[in-house]
Amino acid sequence: MATPHINAELGDFAETVLMPGDPLRAKFIAENFLEDVKQVCDVRSMLGFTGTYKGKRVSVMGHGMGIPSCSIYVHELIKDFGVKNIIRVGSCGAVHDDVKLMDIIIGMGASTDSKVNRIRFNDHDFAAIADFHLLETSVQQARLQNVNVRVGNIFSADLFYSPEEGLFDKMEKLGMLGIDMEAAGIYGVAAELGAKALTILTVSDHIKRGEKLSSEDRQKSFGEMMNVALETAVNI
């Protein structure tokens, strides 16, 4: 049954949904990586698709930008459509000197300046972490593909244009590998509703060094990340 934000029917989504931020990226993934594709939703142009990868059902849907947006879609997918596994696929900025452009980062945990998880946990700190089985499977699949991945803590920011000076230096000191805007929220929703979640990111920018990927390199690293994510989706 359709929800306020997802006009699909029960059974339209696979148990595992890959979620990029951009709905057009979801369409690209469906058209270029999946077979037997069916579009299942389009409310507010947030496109969702279900198809098969190596004979197994997989869905892909955009989640928008930021924790409030992604939390709505993840909540409804899990609670109303029976989705069991959420795998966020996207890009991130890096601040750590040891992280390079095109690195693939798997978010074992996600710190944040958002208060959403404190709201969930009576104003206490909540350790927003990936599901271990998804994490372990993704690392195994990356190794089978000879794809190097970095596993560690990331930071989910509420502000893209942050005025907070000195924060990047502190992130580097604490060993945070990348900065996105959604992972901590997705992990929180999944934990609250009893589902599993993982975040896989490609480094598209190095914030402290002022480096950015070219379009060609961005596409190459995206392809490697998608292969890891899809192999994870069909091997859990």
Curated annotation (Swiss-Prot):
Transmembrane segments: none annotated. InterPro entries: DeoD-type, Nucleoside_phosphorylase_CS, Nucleoside_phosphorylase_d, Nucleoside_phosphorylase_sf. It holds the Pfam family PNP_UDP_1. PROSITE patterns: PNP_UDP_1. CDD domains: PNP_EcPNPI-like. It comes from the Bacteria. One of its GO terms (cellular component) is cytosol. The record marks 218 as: Important for catalytic activity. The active site is at residue 205. It is an enzyme of class 2 (transferase). Phosphate binds at residues 21, 25, 44, 88-91. A purine D-ribonucleoside binds at residues 5, 180-182, 204-205. Keywords: Glycosyltransferase, Transferase. Its EC number is 2.4.2.1. GO terms for biological process: purine nucleoside catabolic process. The keyword Membrane does not apply. GO terms for molecular function: purine-nucleoside phosphorylase activity. It catalyses: a purine D-ribonucleoside + phosphate = a purine nucleobase + alpha-D-ribose 1-phosphate; a purine 2'-deoxy-D-ribonucleoside + phosphate = a purine nucleobase + 2-deoxy-alpha-D-ribose 1-phosphate. HAMAP family: Pur_nucleosid_phosp. Catalyzes the reversible phosphorolytic breakdown of the N-glycosidic bond in the beta-(deoxy)ribonucleoside molecules, with the formation of the corresponding free purine bases and pentose-1-phosphate. Homohexamer; trimer of homodimers. PANTHER family: FI09636P-RELATED (PTHR43691:SF11), URIDINE PHOSPHORYLASE (PTHR43691). Belongs to the PNP/UDP phosphorylase family. This is Purine nucleoside phosphorylase DeoD-type 2. It comes from Photobacterium profundum (strain SS9). The gene is deoD2.
